[in-house]
């Protein structure tokens, strides 16, 4: 019985291909973005379909006040019985950046990073959210001004964004 022994060339090719496969798998797992000092995920701005443009705040000054915060109130679907929706707070910054907060600690380092852009007179917000079931997924909201009320529309929900004036230092800039 004759056995074929691998040649050094075939071993070299096998190691080369296995190395390429391993590096591809590892790089896809670790190149998802970076984290800031507060443990918040920071994505590359190139992953967003909207663009954080310089001077974007000039286009929204009649709609959004950069010195206020906006509290999200879910209008539709109606709240389920004995279920409380998490309320989020939006803070708009200059140059097309928006922070989404789960409480009134408005430190930009603790915010979920988001981008806003004005298109055809409507304000669009985009951010990445995390859930245990889905991992990171993209959320897009269109905001339209109806009289003095801001309404946000996503794929699943309709929101009202209630303006709240707060006192404080608004000089903090986001880290994205």
What do the predicted segments below correspond to?
Residues 29-112, 119, 124-176:
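Lipid interaction determinants
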Residues 1-39:
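Bacterial Sec-dependent N-terminal signal peptides
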